[in-house]
């Protein structure tokens, strides 16, 4: 008998290993139309075909029967702003005006700990109800915003990485701090929360225009003090932003050079957007082991530009998918992948379903340097997964019924699917959400 606590039966799809090309992704794709997943202590013991796994079932334990559903590794969102949840879908501005008009006033509310807790609870529920089990999250500059989010994620034993925004210029006075204050508050939060449960801390300078040299030096010191933390910031999202960086940092030839000068590139650094990078910047990301977060709904909504998917493969840069709520228009990774496909089509790049779901699962985990812990159904991985009902609307039932293989089904899910298709979400081996 296998020493397991829970067994789950259903159809399973994952990418069994990391890949360096889209063809390698396709070669590592694994599909079981009737499989059995064995779990113990929040970890995966084995995924076996039903015919093989049935022999290991304990007669008194049985199994969770999810036949008719498709089980995928939990989605990984590599860039999202939880304080912006309430302002999703704000009309009419591009990046810099959008920050001033909408974002900064909304973020000011998170000085109130009770308000932060209310939004944190709503935000985490949105993540899990959309099948996202791991996220890299921006908070606000208020420590209370970080405390609220980590407290809620800890309650569910989620794998979540987040950090207090750091910014000391070109923001309203009510959101401005000194470099010293930012350093001390961030240091205290790291000591309190980093590696507590499944949580991780991300040092979070908002972006170069809201950072003085002194602030980036403080970030550099924190990186040296706490080398196993993450770093997240924004990079080359908008042409006007890039011109502003050039004006503020004329001594640096390129936007990424500002971060690289302060040693903020590296294996646990994730740069959101990267739409307008040149080849030298792509090469720097590769050489330093840095990652990028591709945020298609946000890039389209703000009119920022089209991310170059092939450049990630060409330069061998790790990449994950980001919803980027609230400039992003959905928490749904299914809908986000559909928009990613359209971004590719506009550049004559065909994003296959296998590649898309790789970026949303194991590829995203790899961008966060978590590929040894999450991202597929390999033995020893943490048991984070999402249960998909592939046909919840009349149109989906018609279309899915005419699919010839799992790849066509996955493509239909990323073009017609949304949160209605999320039947259950499991975190660390426990069901934490299901449809009413």
Whereabouts are the PLM-identified features?
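His/Asp/Glu-enriched, well-ordered alpha-helical/loop segment
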Residues: 261-268, 309-398
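C-terminal cap of metal-dependent C-N hydrolases
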Residues: 24-25, 382-436
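Alpha-helical scaffold segments that flank or form the walls of functional sites
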Residues: 88-158, 182-195
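Divalent metal-coordination and catalytic microenvironments
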Residues: 37, 42, 68, 79, ...
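Metal-coordinating catalytic core of metallo-dependent amide/deamination hydrolases
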Residues: 144-274
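Active-site gating loops and adjacent loop-to-helix segments of metal-dependent hydrolytic enzymes
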Residues: 86-118, 164, 168-179, 238-266, ...
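N-terminal metal-binding scaffold of metallo-dependent hydrolase/deaminase domains
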Residues: 1-58, 67-70
